[in-house]
């Protein structure tokens, strides 16, 4: 199975986990997904009034320079760990 196929499967699997991950893990999943699918963060950082959007953007921005393939593999590995 190609990395892209594994990434797509992990996306589906992440929606069917037996329990919801904690907020920090959810941010990591979000950031890895965005980096794997879109590359480095772009656009403006959300303002102080959008704390959730700001946290999500910051988590994604911390992965700047990580290749999309590496981010996809990390995402797949994290979802696999959460499935256990």
Model-inferred region functions:
Residues 1-84:
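A charge-rich, low-complexity, intrinsically flexible signal that marks solvent-exposed coils, linkers
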């Amino acid at each position: 199975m190609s990395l892209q196929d594994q990434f797509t499967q992990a996306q589906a699997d992440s929606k069917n986990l037996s329990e919801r991950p904690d907020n920090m893990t959810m941010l990591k999943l979000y950031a890895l997904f965005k980096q794997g699918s879109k590359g480095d963060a772009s656009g403006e950082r959300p303002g102080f009034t959008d704390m959730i959007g700001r946290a999500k953007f910051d988590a994604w921005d911390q992965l700047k320079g990580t290749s999309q393939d590496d981010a996809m593999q990390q995402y797949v590995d994290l979802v696999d760990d959460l499935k256990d």
